[in-house]
Amino acid sequence: MAQRIILAFDKFKGSLSSAQVAEAFARGWRCVVPDSDISIVPIADGGDGLLGALSSHLGAKSHDVVAHDPLGNTITTHYATSGDTAIIEMAQVSGLALLNAEERNPLLTSSYGLGEVMRDALSRGAKSMILGIGGSATNDCGMGMLEALGYRFYDAEGEVLEASGDAMCRVARIDVANVDARLSECDIVVASDVDNVLYGERGAAWVYAPQKGATPAMVEALDEGMRRFAKVVGGEWHNVAGAGAAGGLGYALMALLGATLKSGIELVLDTVGFDAMLDDAELVVTGEGRIDRQTLMGKGPAGVLRRARSKGVPVIALGGTVEWCEELASSGFERIYEATPEGMALDEAMQQTTAQQNICHAAMRIAREWLLLHS
């Protein structure tokens, strides 16, 4: 029986945080094997949840800040600092989840709030930033963020533009005279698992804007706007993998702020020293709310699996739901389990208390099976 196990769960989206999933699993496991040494390692893949995952590992201090949401409404959001490193999650201030379905329009939304949070971090002495840019509501090529940091944008007539997806389509000149000088002394690492280029069929607008409320006509306008914006900026950053992340924010961060893009899950695992944790581990359990083909494409559990297998540590996966496919069958997971009982409605299964109970019961079943196989 495994005496030391690592629980490295991503969130069960819309239901439980990664820590809550792991705690529920640990309760169930200890019902069967009470003397197990269990380490909980919350993970995230660059989307929402990165702030919580890194903050818990680093003992980071949380800061509230007043900023603007994607439509310009004033909100109170938060980020964290560990030493002189700021950890910022775009979804907390410029996220799609902040808007209801009727409000989602990437011609109108702006990443300005993200820039405000970054500016606040600079004021607190940040010399480096880790940005999680998943879950965005925007498709403005980072114009809003840049505006909040001192960039100014003008149209062909010399009129000042207020950043938005629509304004991006009319940019003719960028003024950098008032850009926050502290940015030149700040290293920015972007956690993102999106490898799309800026524009074209694999670009931000065509692939992601429809999820943010864009009609086909909007998609065409936004894609053309990104081409225009990239022409004004110059260079070849638009062809770099990840430029299309967060509606072109990845492009702005690389091309204008000198940021480095890194796989979200790899960044988290490196930050927490996951490889060293594996040295005396006998089992790793990972998972997310829905396990399917996409799980293997840069998601958190896939990163955990890759690291653990390189050390010869077996990995079990647990999903709230599982959509079986050939890729999962040959992925290398020791076993893949589903927490939701057969016949239970998804809405019921996602209720927090029910989800915790389902995970706890699944953990008991997994522990018993593991005990039978390894006793």
Feature locations, PLM:
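N-terminal loops that bind phosphate or other acidic moieties
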Residues: 2-133, 137-375
